[in-house]
A protein has these predicted regions:
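Class I S-adenosyl-L-methionine-dependent methyltransferase module
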Residues: 162-166
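Core catalytic lobe of class I
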Residues: 1-147, 151-154
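Conserved SAM-binding loop
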Residues: 157-158
């Protein structure tokens, strides 16, 4: 399979990367969240691959709509996800919170993996941080390789991977 690169920070890469390496951005999603700071969104970009939003379903919004009722009766589980994701940040009181200062929510990483990865692919995270990508990849049945230079964060990653099996 063709390598796929997904970048969620910083947003400037969407403008700089095509000029630097000659690859175009295939898809951009806006992840929005409530925050006490001025910044309340991040762009997530796909390079060298295009996500398939049909792989992930979201609940239907208007359950009284006859068309929606018909789809539900046919066994459909929801609409494909949009390119605008409203998902809360990981906060200090979040169940998934670790000691890492800028942790990405499991739901965001899960949507990225589910819409992009093919069966039997290995998920690689070269800035592993809190280990969310590896944890979610394992939870979804994928093998994963993580790289992190800070030993403190390596310990967090190892703990999360070990504890997920309990």
């Amino acid at each position: 399979p063709t390598p796929c690169v997904i970048i969620h920070y910083p947003e400037e890469t969407i403008n700089l990367l095509p000029k630097a390496i000659g690859v175009k951005c295939e898809q951009v999603v806006c992840w929005v969240y409530n925050s006490n700071t001025g910044k309340q969104s991040r762009l997530i970009s796909w390079w060298g691959c295009k996500p398939d939003f049909r792989k992930v379903r979201q609940p239907y919004k208007n359950l009284n709509d006859k068309r929606i009722q018909k789809r539900i009766a046919e066994g459909k589980t929801g609409a494909k996800i949009y390119d605008w994701w409203n998902i809360n940040q990981v906060k200090n009181v979040s169940k998934e919170k670790t000691e890492h200062p800028c942790q990405i929510p499991e739901e965001v990483i899960g949507k990225i993996i589910k819409t992009t990865a093919e069966e039997n692919q290995t998920i690689i995270d070269v800035f592993a941080g809190s280990g969310t990508t590896s944890k979610v990849a394992y939870d979804l049945g994928y093998d994963t390789i993580s790289y992190e230079v800070d030993k403190k964060y390596c310990d967090i990653i190892n703990k999360r991977i070990y504890e997920r099996g309990k």
